[in-house]
Amino acid sequence: MRLKDPFSLKTADMTKRSNKPKKPRDEDSSDEVGGLTCQHVSRAVDLSSVKKAVTGSLWSVCSDCLKERNVLEGETAGAHDILVCLKCGFQGCNQAEVQHSTKHQQAHHSDSHCITISLTTWKAWCFECKEELSTHCNKKALAQTLDFLQKQSAKATSGTSSKLIKLREEPAEYVDTQRGKSPVNSTLIPVKGINNLGNTCFFNAVMQNLSQTHMLNDLIQDVKEKGHKMKISPSTETNLGSLTVTLPSPEPLTSAMFLFLQSMKESGKGPVSPKILFNQLCQKAPRFKGYQQQDSQELLHYLLDSMRVEETKRIKAGILKAFNNPTEKTADEETKRQVKAYGKEGVKLNFVDRIFVGELTSTIMCEECEHISTVKEAFIDISLPIIEERISKPTNPARLGKSGREQDSLTSHDDSLAAHSQANRNSRRLSGQKLQSRHSSTSHDDRGPDTVSSRQEEDLCVAGRGLSSYRTDTMGSQSDCSEKESNLQDSSNDADSEASESEWSPRIPSVSSHSSTSDKTSITTTLSTTTHNPSLKSNPSSTPLPSIRPQQGGAVEQLVSAVSKLGLVHTSTDTLPISHSQEELSETRDRDRQHHQGAFQVLCHSYTPSSKECSVQSCLHQFTSIELLMGNNKLLCENCTDRRQRQMKRSDKKAEKVYTSARKQMLISALPPVVTLHLKRFHQAGMNLRKVNRHVDFPLLLDLAPFCSATCKNLGSGERVLYSLYGIVEHSGSMRGGHYAAYVKVRTPQRKPEQRRNQSGSREACSAPQGQWVYVSDTTVQTVPESRVLNSQAYLLFYEELL
């Protein structure tokens, strides 16, 4: 039997249905009137599913073409038609070459996906009946769905340009297969304006900086198509060889990012529309729907982390395919071991981790037993509080307890130091309150200075895991100054909703700095990172600080004293020995002293900020300086608690938890090729939301060595670690209404990604690369002098590694 082509109606078919002759009845159909009603309508039409799918996706764009990167942004729409599946809302094209709509119906043949509506002719077609359907049949659902789609079309086309996308016919015109070359005749990436979709300046400013991130443009080429080969080399201790896996097609958000970056590099006039990318992001993070006021740093987190999740899923799928997709039931123990080993290394190869993700190490040392705990966590940016000069109000001593009076006397010796300590206390992400040695730890008395526990290895393996789940501290959001002002209550509610939405996926935390949720106060004293004496003696030029631990020698001697005071005659064999020769005690103290000094040692000389300095370096100095955990903010030391319990083993009473004074420091232990610094200008002060407008100086060339651990990966002691500024996100205005803009540096790419860190000894002679700074505010693009850049009110700073 000859099948009629969908929607290929003769002239007679365009007349009224009353005058239209009946079509030949399909012998397999039970319809009473051919072409008018269909028995599949009741099972193949689901209005609620269509509404959910259509409102959450880009209108009139083939989903499969978008996934396969067969579309480009900013171009006139092609002549092909889009058919909407009335079962699930899938939008597919009817091109002769691909027929995505037909393939969708065939893929879901068992579940009725056979009825579609054309977004061009508004005609319904049943693939099972192979006939056009009447939208006025005895089923109301079909007519209601058509009405919804027509209203949705009116909404989508009323405020948007017809120049959205077009099919890509010649990929070779803009994709250069040679790494390191630009698709145009120059190696410089041009700067184009980006259309504001409605309160999306926060998005546009970030995308301008990402489009000028050369390494991102290079590495994303690897995910542009299905079948990319990836070589995974596990650690030598696994006794496994390298494995080459074939990756499946990239996920929608990563595909949309690739298309956007390509459109930004295309030569041509006019701004670029980010609609495809923005809509895909809204699918991952619904909080950005509705075109409300938002925050650039939050946007950057959601965007990078969502792409990272997609790429991790893609890499895992490639590894499982290499092992013939084993399951928990079918795989043997050896296969499980190999899959786990390759997966552990493979997930680290996603392009987000390779470009933006670094590592920080938080070191905490108990002042009583000198047990050292370390916590390593990944970051995609470092949030730095801006130091504000404030006049501290006098505190009534009568309202303080004993510990409060001790703390007050400690801080009264130096007002300036106390003010800085207050800022330092607010800058810490980790509270000393009830910090336990559940953290991955190294202990001089148990494992030796170089032994790392298995818990630490787990922390390093599980990317995106830190001490807590991701949480952003930015309260409220900002938008264009031409937009309507939002009240403080709305901003507060927006921040509250963010906390619940942040659980949508495992997330790499930013190294955010916020105050402890406890109402207890900790006294934090900023010390030079070159001071390593466990007694924490202060600089002789300053007023001496009272000791925070008894000067009775080492930990063993303190334990001897404690045992003698308790009057315990018998000790169990698992307690530390209390009798040593003087030589053994001396050797132990020397070894411990060296280990403790190394734990708090930086890569090179520490940075010393000048008086009243407010710069990126002074903020980093504050972030990485040593602080004391004491008073009501002491450390809950499990090591001391265990020792107390062993000493009281013969007693029926359970030893109380031991809280001790401690030292804590956060240092960078692994640097990514691109370091993003977030200046915390927005925060909550009491019941109010406020913005810090103080200018922060930032260098064009930043040396991060003073803020890196001495054990920082791939770096030698005493080296300079230079990073060059290439992008800024600026916020102007207030909390109620403001505007985001970008400054980007157009420059020649330094080198290919595989050449990074392969050279050494050339850091001293490095200088910032030459280039032209460009100011971009949505569609406004203009070149600016360097002086204007340095005077901007920076919110996000993008630095790239220099060799």
Swiss-Prot record:
GO molecular function, one term: zinc ion binding
Catalytic activity: Thiol-dependent hydrolysis of ester, thioester, amide, peptide and isopeptide bonds formed by the C-terminal Gly of ubiquitin (a 76-residue protein attached to proteins as an intracellular targeting signal)
GO terms of biological process kind: cell migration; neural retina development; photoreceptor cell maintenance; protein deubiquitination; proteolysis
Keyword Nucleus: yes
Binding annotation for Zn(2+) 3: 85, 88, 104, 113
Entry keywords, A to Z: Cytoplasm, Hydrolase, Metal-binding, Nucleus, Protease, Thiol protease, Ubl conjugation pathway, Zinc, Zinc-finger
Statement: the UniProt record of this protein carries the keyword Zinc: yes
Distribution of this protein across tissues and organs: Retina.
Intracellular or extracellular location(s): Photoreceptor inner segment; Cytoplasm; Nucleus
Binding site for Zn(2+) 2: 62, 65, 93, 100
GO cellular component: cytoplasm; nucleus; photoreceptor inner segment
Record's protein name: Ubiquitin carboxyl-terminal hydrolase 45
Residues covered by region (Disordered): 1-34, 394-554
Biased composition (Basic and acidic residues): 403-417
Organism: Danio rerio (Zebrafish)
Top EC group: hydrolase
Residues given in the record as Zn(2+) 1 binding sites: 38, 40, 126, 129
Family the UniProt entry places it in: Belongs to the peptidase C19 family.
InterPro entries: Papain-like_cys_pep_sf (IPR038765), Peptidase_C19 (IPR050164), Peptidase_C19_UCH (IPR001394), USP_CS (IPR018200), USP_dom (IPR028889), Znf_RING/FYVE/PHD (IPR013083), Znf_UBP (IPR001607)
ZnF segments: UBP-type: 36-153
Superkingdom in the source lineage: Eukaryota
Gene ablation phenotype (knockout): Morpholino-treated larvae show a reduction in eye size and significantly fewers green cone photoreceptors compared to the wild-type. Moderate to severe eye morphological defects, with a defective formation of the retinal structures.
This protein's encoding gene: usp45
Low complexity bias spans: 502-531
Active site: 201 (nucleophile), 739 (proton acceptor)
EC number(s) stated in the UniProt entry for this protein: 3.4.19.12
Polar residues bias locations: 419-440, 469-480, 532-545
